């Protein structure tokens, strides 16, 4: 059985993420979408909320499961018996950063990274940009799954109420 891990912060999951996850799921027997935990960053959503949104958003992909990890990705991949990391690339800036990470991961563990070019429809999308636009009242409804969009608007309203 071939498997891959598809890591990210997914804060929140976007349609761009789902495009890459779906395409990876078509190539591998199993894809583990892994919410990477960075203790130095406070996300808009908790890790548990991100997992829940990912599980809901990938429910139609039977060979996809969702998890989280707080250490080196290659350690997780080895623990799971996974030999490939799948990353989406939006453009040259992503490539420059991701190539260095891929080379380090390969050196540390022998785990290879496979790059999937992002569908041009989503090449501008990032969770950070979506959050920023939504915070200022921009319409991001076509950039996220419907339930994720609703949760994003609710969370932004909660944060605004807390700060006023």
Curated annotation (Swiss-Prot):
Keywords: ATP-binding, Coenzyme A biosynthesis, Cytoplasm, Magnesium, Nucleotide-binding, Nucleotidyltransferase, Transferase. Its cofactor is Mg(2+). It is found in: Cytoplasm. Substrate binds at residues 9, 41, 73, 87. Reversibly transfers an adenylyl group from ATP to 4'-phosphopantetheine, yielding dephospho-CoA (dPCoA) and pyrophosphate. Belongs to the bacterial CoaD family. This is Phosphopantetheine adenylyltransferase. The gene is coaD.
């Amino acid at each position: 059985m071939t498997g891959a891990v598809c890591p990210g912060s997914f804060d929140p999951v976007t349609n761009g993420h789902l495009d890459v996850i779906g395409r990876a799921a078509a190539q591998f027997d199993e894809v583990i979408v892994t919410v990477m935990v960075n203790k130095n960053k406070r996300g808009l959503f908790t890790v548990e909320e991100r997992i829940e949104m990912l599980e809901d958003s990938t429910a139609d992909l039977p060979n996809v499961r969702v998890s989280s990890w707080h250490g080196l990705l290659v350690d997780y991949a080895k623990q799971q018996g996974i030999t490939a990391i799948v990353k989406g690339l939006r453009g040259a800036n992503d490539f420059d950063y991701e190539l260095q990470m891929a080379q380090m991961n390969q050196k540390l563990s022998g785990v290879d990274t496979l790059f999937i070019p992002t569908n041009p429809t989503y090449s501008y999308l990032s969770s950070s940009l979506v959050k920023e636009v939504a915070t200022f009242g921009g319409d991001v409804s076509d950039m996220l799954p419907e339930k994720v969009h609703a949760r994003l608007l609710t969370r932004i309203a909660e944060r605004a109420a807390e700060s006023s």
